[in-house]
Amino acid sequence: MASVKRKGRRWQGEEVRALREHLGLTQEGLARELGTRQQTISEWETGRYQPRGTANTLLSLVAERAGFSYQAGEKKP
């Protein structure tokens, strides 16, 4: 299992969406898992805002636990 680099990682909108889909969650479901609002997930995915601080770290931890790795531009099989 590839480790996700936590420190200094900046999550982009398409990565957040890919992680959510990898987990099989809706925006509401991911928001519940992270303790945030569905609107926040939507804003991250559309690029209006980027996750910062604790949210950034939580996304990396969830990704690592789920065995998720992603490169920009990657398509789902």
Residue ranges of model-derived segments:
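A detector for short, charged/polar N-terminal pre-domain segments
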Residues: 1-11
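DNA major-groove recognition helix of helix-turn-helix/homeodomain DNA-binding modules
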Residues: 2, 52-72
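Short, amphipathic alpha-helical "recognition" segments used to contact nucleic acids or chromatin
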Residues: 10-22
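Key DNA-contacting residues within the recognition helix of helix-turn-helix
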Residues: 17, 42-43, 52, 60
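Residue-level detection of the helix-turn-helix DNA-binding "recognition helix"
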Residues: 21, 35, 46, 64
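Short alpha-helical DNA-recognition segment
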Residues: 24-43
